[in-house]
UniProtKB/Swiss-Prot annotation:
Remaining remarks: A lyase-type mechanism (elimination/hydration) is suggested for the cleavage of the lactyl ether bond of MurNAc 6-phosphate, with the formation of an alpha,beta-unsaturated aldehyde intermediate with (E)-stereochemistry, followed by the syn addition of water to give product.
Organism of this sequence: Enterococcus faecalis (strain ATCC 700802 / V583)
The organism's place on the tree of life at top rank: Bacteria
Recorded catalytic activity of this chain's protein: N-acetyl-D-muramate 6-phosphate + H2O = N-acetyl-D-glucosamine 6-phosphate + (R)-lactate
UniProt name for this protein: N-acetylmuramic acid 6-phosphate etherase 2
Amino acid sequence: MNLENLTTERRNENTMGLDEMSVKEALQKMNQEDQKVAMAVGQELAAIEPVVEAIIKSFNQGGRLIYMGAGTSGRLGVLDAAECVPTFGVEPEMVQGLIAGGQKAMTVAVEGAEDSKELGRQDLVDLKLSANDIVVGIAASGRTPYVIGGLEYATTVGAATATVACNKNAEISKYAQMPIEVDAGPEFLTGSTRLKSGTAQKLILNMLSTISMIGIGKVYNNLMVDVKPTNEKLVERSKRIIMEATGCSYEVAELKFVEAEENVKLAIVMILTDSTKEEATQKLIDGNQFIKNTLN
């Protein structure tokens, strides 16, 4: 295995002598390196766009978005998937994160898990992967066998495939229809891909899930109108979203929120179209769940 040619494994000339720096100097250096990440991601928008479009297509045909990764890459996929539930009001099955070694690997390393192609395949078999789904393999190094095994299996069942790697000409790119390769340069701490690579991956996963959810009507203007009010903070946020979307008072927002059985999107349509709960429900069905389509 030839790792020394990978950007993520090279020493960073800008951060030599870390152990001789003051805390202030080290913080400044780290911040300087982190600022390069968003710029690097920005260079890959043309590669990210078709992946978002493929995810929207998958969702529209009842498919799922499945992230796969090992270590930090896997944890980031699990994190993004978990946040889709409260943010966009989707079922947990719609966006899922698989990590080599399973749930235990979220907190401790599982020996050998990332090196098993068969484990990657089996995890997708267990999910009953179908041609309607899309699999996004995540690997900073771009060579994780667990991810490659999953991508190979996904191809055999006809699922769409994409990858997120932090090295150019990554091995996993050969196994995906839509590879994303972002080069943010060597890590602040040599080889520690939880840092810049992890940040780059998080930014890209944010884009994939968020822009895809916009594409299926989960957002009105820039408001998350399918938020699930699962705690007191989110209940209050829900009422504010209704106020922002409609220009109504807090009292009206609260009333319609209750009438709509805490369904923010429904409450907004009820107010904007002066409809009953039943009428607003039908308008959303007719409008494919987009608020803007109920206003025509």
